[in-house]
Regions:
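Short, surface-exposed ligand- or partner-binding patches at beta-edge/loop junctions that are enriched
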Residues: 61
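Rhodanese-like catalytic fold shared by cysteine-dependent sulfurtransferases
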Residues: 1-20, 26-58, 66-100
Length: 100
C-alpha cells in the first residue's frame, strides 16, 4: 500500500479547521516539543486507543516520518483519512514552524 505523504511545504499554515495532528512519538519526545493542539498517542498504544481519534482528516507525525508512515498505513486500513508528514518533527522545526 502506498502511504499518502505530504512534504512540509505542502502543509497549510495555519493548519485548517477540522484537521487533527496525531503525534505518535514517545512521551519523552513529545515533552521536548510538539505541534500546538496536536493529539498525542504513542505508536504502540494506537491499537488500544483508536476510538479516541476523531473522524476527519489526520496529519500523522513522528520524529522523521518512519513511525508515522506505519501508523498512517494502519489508520487507512481502518477506514481513516490519514496523511504522513514526510520528515516529521525534524522538518517541522527546520522550517521554523512553532512548537510548544
Amino acid at each position: 500500500m502506498n502511504v499518502p505523504t505530504v512534504a512540509i511545504t505542502g502543509v497549510p499554515d495555519p493548519l485548517p479547521e477540522g484537521l487533527t495532528v496525531l503525534d505518535v512519538r514517545e512521551p519523552v519526545e513529545w515533552a521536548h516539543g510538539h505541534i500546538d493542539g496536536a493529539m498525542h498517542i504513542p505508536m504502540m498504544e494506537l491499537p488500544d486507543r483508536l476510538d479516541e481519534i476523531p473522524d476527519g482528516q489526520l496529519l500523522v507525525v513522528c520524529k522523521v516520518g518512519s513511525r508515522s508512515a506505519q501508523v498512517t498505513s494502519y489508520l487507512l486500513q481502518h477506514g481513516r483519512d490519514a496523511v504522513n508528514l514526510d520528515g516529521g518533527m525534524l522538518e517541522w522545526a527546520q522550517a521554523g514552524l512553532p512548537v510548544v
